[in-house]
Amino acid sequence: MRQVVLLFAFLCFAQTSNAQLFSKEKIRNLENEDKKRLSWGYYLGFNNMDFNFDYNEDKPDILVDKSVGFNVGLIGNLRIMEYIDLRLEPGLTITTRNLTYDESYFDGIEYTESDLMREVKSTYIYIPLLVKFSSKRLNNFKPFVVGGISTAINLSSNEKNPDDNSSGQFRTKTNMLFYEVGFGVDFYLAFFKFTPSIRGVFAINDEVVPDVDPNSPWTGNINSMKTRGVFINLTFQ
């Protein structure tokens, strides 16, 4: 994920350092792009998602092994006023997180090495409604900040699955709410607008579905489990 962040920073630096942006003879690409009431596009990106745990008892933390996931979706942009836009960005977000439990969670219980690990796969239909606050356009780029709320449906939640961790299945909730904040830069190229952005995403509601046994070593000590993560998206409009 560090390499992805460095790539994002390099793209921004390379574009803003381009002589065309600051030369006296400026060529303004897509001059009327921001005057459109409605505009459309799509995005591709990466995510790195974690869990934030709140525990009932003081035990060693559940470790989360994160992996780089994938984002893809569409964009609908409504111009509210000169520097404010309302954006709907429905898409698909896929990620996998592996949980590792300390042996102390299984005191007095027979267990195997596989019991100490659980895989949590998430496939979200992700629908954010965002407000974008832009600065004044400078030649062919325009920085902005963005924030809003999102609803998500986790197609891999297994919430209704009768099998729980006693059968090897870690269950999560299907319906989720998030808030997100971030920033990015619009680059006006010859034929389209290219926008790299980075965002922090934070779950509002608890995601864990408790096991049937209230004293389950996997969920009994979890008071809440909330997703948090970073999105890096590349947008084309």
List each model region and its residues:
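Bacterial Sec-dependent N-terminal signal peptides
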Residues: M1-E25, L234-Q237
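Surface-exposed strand-loop-strand hairpins of Gram-negative outer-membrane beta-barrel proteins
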Residues: N47-N71, I75, T174
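Outer-membrane beta-barrel translocator domains and adjoining extracellular loop/strand segments
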Residues: N52-K59, L99-Y105, S156-D164, E207-N215
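Gram-negative (and chloroplast) outer-membrane scaffold detector with strong preference
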Residues: E25, N29, D34-L38, F46-N52, ...
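Predominantly the C-terminal beta-signal and adjacent terminal strand-loop region
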Residues: A190-Q237
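Residues that define the transmembrane beta-barrel architecture of outer-membrane proteins
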Residues: K36-L38, K66-F70, K121-I127, F141, ...
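Extracellular loop and loop/strand-boundary signature of outer-membrane beta-barrel proteins
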Residues: I27-R28, D58-L63, T112-R118, N165-R171, ...
